[in-house]
Amino acid sequence: MEKKKNIWVGKIVVIVLIIVSIGSYYVFPSVKHVMNQVFKMFASGDFAVVRDFVASYGAYAALISFLLMIFQSIAAPLPAFLITFANANLFGWWQGAILSWSSAMAGAAVCFFIARILGRDVAEKLTSKAGMQQIDTFFKKYGKNTVLICRLLPFISFDIVSYAAGLTSMSFISFFVATGVGQLPATIVYSYVGGMLTGGAKFLVTGLLILFALSALIFMGRKIYMDRQNKKAK
C-alpha cells in the first residue's frame, strides 16, 4: 500500500514538473527564446556553437552545462558528445570529463526514474517506439550487460537505454553502477579529444567513433560466441 502511494506521489510530482516546464515555454518569452536556442544549437551538430552558448553564461557555465546534459538525456536522442567536447574545450580535458561524467550520470538517473514512475507510454513518447523495441531485444539477449554493451556503441542513444532499463526489474543501484563504469572510457576519450578539438578535427572524431563501434562489435561477437558455447555444453 505504501509503495503504491509513493508511486502515485512520484507520478504527480513528475507530471506537475512537466506541466510547469511546458507552461513556462509558452507563457514566458525569455524561456521560449532560450529553449529555441538550445534546440537550434543541438541541431547544428557543431560543438563550437555549444561551447559558445555555455561560455556565454560566465561563472554559471558549469551549471548550465550540467543542466544541458540532463535536458539532452530527457529529450533523447540529442547528441551528448557535443556537450562533452564543449566541456573539455572550456574547462580542460580532465575537469571537463568530471563535469560530463557526473552530469550524464544525473541525466541517466532522471530517465530511469521517469520510465519507472510514469511507465512505457511516456518513455516511448520521449524517445521512439522503434528505439525502445530495439533496446528491449538487447535486454532479452544480454540482460543487465545491455547497459555496458550499449554504452560501447556510439550509434545507439544511451538515453533510450536508460528509459528501457527503468521498465525492467533491474535495480537502480545495478543500473547506476553499470552506467558509471560503462560510460567512463568514452567520456575520458571524448574529453581528451575535445580538449584539443578544432574545426579541422572532424576526421579524428569520425575515426574515434568507428573505433568504438568496432570495439563494441568485437565485444558483442565474443559474447554471442560464448553464449552459444555454453548452450552446447548444456
Whereabouts are the PLM-identified features?
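Core hydrophobic alpha-helical transmembrane segments of single-pass membrane proteins
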Residues: V14-V20, L211-A216
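Residue-level recognition of pore/gate-forming positions within transmembrane alpha-helices
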Residues: M69, A104, A108, Q183, ...
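Membrane-interfacial helix-loop-helix
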Residues: E2-G10, S21-S65, M105-I160, L167-T168, ...
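Hydrophobic alpha-helical membrane segments of integral membrane proteins
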Residues: K11, A55, A59-S102, T137-L197
